[in-house]
């Protein structure tokens, strides 16, 4: 793909390819719409057709994150926006497939408490929508939460999970999956090989919140075995958990209550999103 100056998506839109932003399992390029503009305002994610996570991500954008459904859902609830990117193009070459979204800015790094509270509410709203569509995100971590012009975006839908079997019964808890992701933010269920359920998404968000509020995750730089051991212990002793996350004793009570509520959820339980959200809504 490096030899191409431009490519066309399935709707015939031309995308001019710029510098590489990231190279890992997939490659991210800066792209722009035409030759007259010098600004690369979009990002193209591209991978080989044999790479299933990118195909799953494209399908998820099309079937679950459609703009009309999002617009109706937010209007009914009086929500300004969800942290879900718009899709601007999908395409393929002989060997590759790709999609295009806006350049969504930098990793969210809050500068004040007010922005943290707002981010918590926005992310709970966003996860509630994804869960209402019968899926979980499965990969909530700081590098997947971006901000541009005071607007958050949750990216990377390559590890989404379907929550329900035929007949609308919840999937069973089975520890039979190969785990993947950043072990620092991974939920306990995922560590143990279970599919991420609603409580898992909210648990991972909680670990992001701890850092947003100025705390530290006590298991960072530990081996994966030690990380899961610590997380399981901390679920039993939440007071100790927050003593280690906030050694100066400045943990927000709203955050403590959020973690307490999330830790008590059953695997297949639908959370009380309103209750979680109200913790962070400032009058």
UniProtKB/Swiss-Prot annotation:
Signal peptide range equals none
Is Transferase included in the keywords of this UniProt record?
yes
The answer to keyword Phosphoprotein applying to this record is: no
Q: Where along the chain is ATP bound?
A: 1, 30
Alphabetical list of PROSITE patterns matching this protein: PROTEIN_KINASE_DOM
Per UniProt, activity regulation is:
Both catalytically active kinases B1/VPK1 and host VRK2 repress B12 inhibitory activity in a B1/VPK1 deletion mutant strain.
Q: Which UniProt keywords apply?
A: ATP-binding, Early protein, Host nucleus, Kinase, Nucleotide-binding, Serine/threonine-protein kinase, Transferase
Pfam families the UniProt entry points to:
PK_Tyr_Ser-Thr
Compartments (UniProt record): Host nucleus
Boundaries of every Protein kinase domain copy: 1-283
Role of this protein: Pseudokinase that plays a role in viral DNA replication repression by activating the antiviral protein BANF1 and inhibiting the activity of host VRK1, a cellular modulator of BANF1.
Q: How does it assemble?
A: Interacts with B1/VPK1. Interacts with host VRK1. Interacts with host VRK2.
For this entry, the protein name equals Pseudokinase OPG198
Q: Which gene encodes it?
A: OPG198
């Amino acid at each position: 793909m490096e030899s191409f100056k431009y490519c066309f998506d399935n709707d015939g839109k031309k995308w001019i390819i710029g510098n590489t932003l990231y190279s890992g399992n997939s490659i991210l390029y800066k792209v722009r719409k035409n030759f007259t503009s010098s600004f690369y305002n979009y990002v193209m994610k591209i991978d080989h057709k044999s790479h299933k996570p990118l195909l799953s991500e494209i399908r998820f954008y099309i079937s679950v994150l459609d703009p009309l459904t999002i617009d109706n859902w937010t209007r009914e609830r009086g929500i300004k926006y969800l942290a879900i990117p718009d899709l601007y193009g999908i395409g393929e070459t002989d060997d590759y497939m790709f999609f295009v979204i806006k350049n969504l800015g930098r990793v969210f790094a809050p500068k004040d408490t007010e922005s943290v509270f707002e981010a918590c509410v926005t992310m709970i709203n966003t996860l509630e929508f994804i869960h209402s569509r019968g899926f979980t995100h499965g990969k909530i971590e700081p590098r997947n939460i971006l901000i541009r012009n005071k607007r958050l975006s949750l990216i990377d839908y390559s590890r989404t999970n379907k929550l329900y079997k035929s007949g609308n019964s919840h999937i069973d808890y089975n520890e039979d999956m190969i785990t993947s992701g950043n072990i620092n933010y991974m939920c306990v269920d995922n560590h143990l090989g279970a599919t991420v359920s609603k409580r898992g998404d909210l648990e991972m968000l909680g670990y992001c919140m701890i850092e947003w509020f100025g705390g530290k995750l006590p298991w960072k730089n530990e081996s994966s075995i030690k990380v899961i051991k610590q997380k399981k212990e901390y679920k039993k002793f939440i007071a100790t958990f927050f003593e280690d996350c906030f050694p100066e004793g400045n943990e927000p009570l709203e955050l403590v209550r959020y973690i307490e509520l999330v830790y008590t959820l059953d695997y297949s339980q639908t959370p009380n999103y309103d209750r979680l959200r109200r913790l962070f809504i400032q009058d």
